[in-house]
Amino acid sequence: PQALSAMCPTLLALTSARDLGVILDSELSFDKHISKLSQSCFFRLRRLRAIRASLSSSALHTLVHAFICSRLDFCNSTFYGLKASNVDRLQSIFNAAARLLLNVPKFEHISVAIRDALHWLPVKQRIEFKVCLLVRNCLKGSAPEYLRELCVTIGMNEFRPNTRAAERGDLFEPRVRTERFGRRGFSAAGPHMWNSLPTDITQLATTNGTDT
């Protein structure tokens, strides 16, 4: 770590820091956070497996959602753009949780069962869904102002002329120079993903009065 000294005792820069339960590192790789998360979730899965015979199906589902799914979904919009190896690590936790719920052997294929029996989205799609949900909340005015300011329709942006995209209500996508920090930011990722959705879905999502 680099040291910082300016008329005060030398301060060492940290390579990672915890904020709201998420471990952030200087490269935004989330390697350390995912390692801690994986360790914690697999520990809880082992404990649940040990008492599985004493639990009803509904109780087991409740415990898995409380101790596993909720932890994996917490702040998962920050995982957008993760390298594939880390996405796979998160998916392995979901797979293990699904095997516990469905009593599927370790080496048996689980993806179809996750989709058909549990109706769970894969990790990558769960992350993308959370980003789109945040955009939807911004457009409906229920998100914090600092996020709403990042979701501006093309017709409202004075730097862009009226186009067919403006007629569709597409969001303004800022130019970014870097993949790691620019394209993964909500200001770029949110509008890009929202604009890629079919128009009938975006219109339904923003006109529906029920928050989900």
Language-model segment annotations:
Residues P1-T212:
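Hydrophobic/basic alpha-helical segments
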